[in-house]
Amino acid sequence: MVALNGKVVIVTGASSGIGASLARGFSREGALVTLAARREDRLREVARSCLHEVLVVPADLLRPQDRETIVQETTARWGRIDILVNNAGMGMYGPFLQTTEAAWRQIFETNLFSMVFLTQAVLPVMQTQGEGLVLNLASIGGLIAHAEKVAAYVASKHAVVGFSRGLARDLAGTGIRVLAACPHLTATEFFRFSPGAEEMAPTVEKFKSFMDSPEDVAQGILNQLDSDRLVVFPTAKPAKVFEKQRDI
């Protein structure tokens, strides 16, 4: 496992779920963590549960100024950025023909473009340092079509994996690494707040016992930060699903 004591980490989508668990995990290992998300009250709850110093930055990642604020406040506080965790994202459930153009744009703005543009804002800091890690939260849905009625979500997460691969090629030899974590279904509030949540509820309930906990996913990611593979599976479940369905 990578030594994290004193490392400066930005975690987006840190107000709940995998993001909150990652923030706590990094802090437990001695990292200095910037917590970024829209819900300031929830960020402060997470901050109180962290063991080391944290910085709370309420931010809407779709706003360029908010992305710049995350970078500026982090470097002003700690002088560097060692790890960027692009975790913020959304789900979407519904028949393809009923998924509007606006919905497609929304999920790509949230799951891909906010990640791309925050990475662009952070990379100059890492390039000056000559080292860093960009950790992108994708999904098993970024590798296979893991369910029905999630075409928009699957497309956006495939784009995240593709972005990660392309970025890794561009950054080869710079000292900056890229990882794409691909968890399976995780027991978080993610599903409750996704468009189509009501229709998706029976499916979520059906697979509840098969879901990973956000704590297990976060720990699995932390354990693989030094992986020489670009795509990492936080737990055994997504790896098994991928092997079973990869040719479908």
Identify the function of each model-found stretch.
Residues 15-16:
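Conserved glycine-rich cofactor-binding loop
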Residues 180, 199-244:
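C-terminal helical subdomain
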Residues 119, 156:
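Active-site helix of classical SDR
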Residues 29-45:
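Conserved glycine-rich Rossmann-like NAD(P)H-binding loop of the short-chain dehydrogenase/reductase
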Residues 95-96, 103-108:
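Substrate-binding pocket helix/loop in short-chain dehydrogenase/reductase
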Residues 139:
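Residue(s) in the substrate-gating loop at a strand-loop-helix junction
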Residues 59-69, 101:
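The beta1-alpha1 cofactor-binding region of Rossmann-like NAD(H)/NADP(H)-dependent oxidoreductases
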